[in-house]
Amino acid sequence: MNYWIQHRLNCLEQAFNPKYCRALEHTIGIVARQFKAGNKLLICGNGGSAADAQHIAAEFVGRFQLHRKGLPAIALGTNPATLTAWSNDYEFETVFARQVEAFAQPGDILWGISTSGKSANVIRAMEMAKDLGLLTIGMAGNNGGMLKDLTDYPLFVSEYHTPYIQEIHLITYHRICEQVEAQLFAKAGLEAQIAV
């Protein structure tokens, strides 16, 4: 058991190196800035990454720690009717891109999550986002895979083992949620209103 814990901690320490932490801080800044400007965040992924997308949206719409107003974040994998209608009539590969086309405005952010970096529907969504003038965050293993050229704010790790990538992702987006919330609301005196 001790070996397993130490191995996981070593993986996390390697992942959160200075370069990755700088990228993380840049991402926090852009998410806070775009929310403050009235833009929204769209998030997409498959499987565990779809669950992560829902988790991120819930933290922003609800709250992470502070009692504050909701922030506009939408997970694109949550509407079964939309997902199945589009996939049945057209193709699953563009199921997120179609929603980006429907919901996004210039200045919004698309956050694509893919542990492999090669999820076709996430890639197509990122392509649509670039066409529409959105900012893009890419969160992936495998050094970014095919998301590299489509990502303005990369959060890529060199890890190839999916469970380890997912653990890194969880810590990463919790940090983003925590710090975006703090930047937007703690200065207004809400730091004393921490939810428990």
Curated annotation (Swiss-Prot):
Cofactor section: Zn(2+)
Keyword set, alphabetical order: Carbohydrate metabolism, Cytoplasm, Isomerase, Metal-binding, Zinc
Catalytic activity: 2 D-sedoheptulose 7-phosphate = D-glycero-alpha-D-manno-heptose 7-phosphate + D-glycero-beta-D-manno-heptose 7-phosphate
One GO process term, biological-process aspect: D-glycero-D-manno-heptose 7-phosphate biosynthetic process
Residues bound to substrate: N46, G47, G48, E59, N88, D89, S114, T115, S116, S119, Q166
Gene3D superfamilies, per the entry: Glucose-6-phosphate isomerase like protein, domain 1
Binding annotation for Zn(2+): H55, E59, Q166, H174
Misc: The reaction produces a racemic mixture of D-glycero-alpha-D-manno-heptose 7-phosphate and D-glycero-beta-D-manno-heptose 7-phosphate.
Domain SIS: 31-196
Protein name: Phosphoheptose isomerase
One cellular component (GO) term of this entry: cytoplasm
Cell location: Cytoplasm
Annotated GO MF terms: carbohydrate derivative binding; D-sedoheptulose 7-phosphate isomerase activity; zinc ion binding
Pathway(s) this gene product operates in, as recorded in its UniProt entry: Carbohydrate biosynthesis; D-glycero-D-manno-heptose 7-phosphate biosynthesis; D-glycero-alpha-D-manno-heptose 7-phosphate and D-glycero-beta-D-manno-heptose 7-phosphate from sedoheptulose 7-phosphate: step 1/1
Organism: Crocosphaera subtropica (strain ATCC 51142 / BH68) (Cyanothece sp. (strain ATCC 51142))
EC class name: isomerase
EC number: 5.3.1.28
Cofactor binding note: Binds 1 zinc ion per subunit.
Keyword Isomerase belongs to the record: yes
Domain of life, source organism: Bacteria
Functional description taken from the UniProt entry: Catalyzes the isomerization of sedoheptulose 7-phosphate in D-glycero-D-manno-heptose 7-phosphate.
Record InterPro entries: GmhA/DiaA (IPR035461), Phosphoheptose_Isoase (IPR004515), SIS_dom (IPR001347), SIS_dom_sf (IPR046348), SIS_GmhA/DiaA_subfam (IPR050099)
Gene name for this UniProt entry: gmhA
Family statement drawn from the similarity comment of this UniProt entry: Belongs to the SIS family. GmhA subfamily.
HAMAP family per the UniProt record, alphabetical: GmhA
